[in-house]
Regions:
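Key residue(s) within conserved catalytic/signature motifs
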Residues: 1-181
Length: 181
């Protein structure tokens, strides 16, 4: 109920809202929760109409340049906005490569601006994959125009899960940043 109210408030304030739940069945799928959240966000943009689509098409093309196909391969809805045809010589690297990570982060950065911060809500963080946690770490440390809300079941967090170290690291970063201010 709280998340639905947050979504309503975000939409009323013209913020973009992306939400997703990580999957317990196969937590090893790279970027699973982040991809679901971005698909949710793109669904909102697609419903806004042709003027908005054109604006986002320009923003995304400017940011991604010739690398949009990497993102389209994992988020096909993006092609509804960009209308790019994949060239025969374009190949998509493994989603775990540094190149893909950088382009994926650039893609997310397009939606986070000073005047319109992105609200990202991720549930069941305990099932997050390493790649998603890497993107979250980047967003938390490098991007100032995003509100990230995560939920997890503390009783399901074990030291062998990737999220265990992630939460500890984020808490340390927050404490360090707070003590410097």
């Amino acid at each position: 109920k709280l998340l639905n109210e947050l979504c309503r408030t975000s939409v009323k304030n013209k913020n973009y809202f992306a939400k997703a739940t990580f999957d317990q069945v196969d937590p090893s799928i790279p970027y699973s929760g982040i991809i679901k959240a971005m698909r949710f966000l793109l669904g909102q943009i697609i419903l806004e109409g042709p003027d908005s689509l054109l604006l986002w098409q320009h923003k995304l093309n400017d940011a991604l340049k010739t690398n949009a196909h990497m993102i389209i391969d994992v988020i096909p809805e993006l092609d509804t906005i960009l209308h790019q045809k994949k060239h025969a010589n374009q190949t998509t690297p493994s989603p775990s490569t540094l190149t893909f990570n950088l382009h994926f982060q650039t893609f997310i950065d397009v939606f986070t601006t000073n005047h319109l911060p992105l609200v990202l809500v991720l549930d069941d963080l305990q099932w997050a994959d390493i790649e998603s946690l890497s993107v979250l770490d980047y967003l938390l440390t490098e991007n100032k125009n995003i509100l990230i809300i995560v939920a997890y079941r503390e009783n399901e967090i074990h030291s062998n899960l990737p999220v265990f170290n992630f939460i500890s690291t984020i808490i340390q970063k927050i404490c360090s940043k707070t003590s410097r201010q």
